[in-house]
Amino acid sequence: MGRMHAPGKGLSQSALPYRRSVPTWLKLTSDDVKEQIYKLAKKGLTPSQIGVILRDSHGVAQVRFVTGNKILRILKSKGLAPDLPEDLYHLIKKAVAVRKHLERNRKDKDAKFRLILIESRIHRLARYYKTRRVLPPNWKYESSTASALVA
């Protein structure tokens, strides 16, 4: 996928495994993988961090092939899903960091401009999640309360 506010084409991406079946050497069952997901989610890890740990430590290439569901769906069924979607959370976290930087460096014009771009991405993503009913329709990003969202 291309970049929104940069000239890069963004062609690089990871390739999915060709076979969608569970590898024969994988000894974990669907229930074992789900238990691992619950355990890692209770530690406070995000769905993508859980996927990386399962891939690197347990040899689960794609959770969906083993369990039949994606990590976020498994977490939602148990009520362990994060309140904010992960990509929106990280954008808000980045905006808070840039705002904190601007408090110390008021004349940093480039940071001011980048903050505008980050916040426009936040608004665009929030609009998307409102139409998908992931966020409530009255949810609004405000820079004054943003640090409380990511704390």
From Swiss-Prot:
SUPFAM superfamilies: S15/NS1 RNA-binding domain. InterPro entries: Ribosomal_uS15, Ribosomal_uS15_arc_euk, Ribosomal_uS15_N, uS15_NS1_RNA-bd_sf. One of its GO terms (molecular function) is small ribosomal subunit rRNA binding. GO terms for biological process: translation. The keyword Transmembrane does not apply. It is found in: Cytoplasm. GO terms for cellular component: cytosolic small ribosomal subunit; nucleolus. Keywords: Cytoplasm, Ribonucleoprotein, Ribosomal protein. Gene3D superfamilies: 4.10.860.130, S15/NS1, RNA-binding. PANTHER family: RIBOSOMAL PROTEIN S15P/S13E (PTHR11885), SMALL RIBOSOMAL SUBUNIT PROTEIN US15 (PTHR11885:SF6). Belongs to the universal ribosomal protein uS15 family. Component of the small ribosomal subunit. This is Small ribosomal subunit protein uS15. It comes from Xenopus laevis. The lineage of its organism: Eukaryota, Metazoa, Chordata, Craniata, Vertebrata.
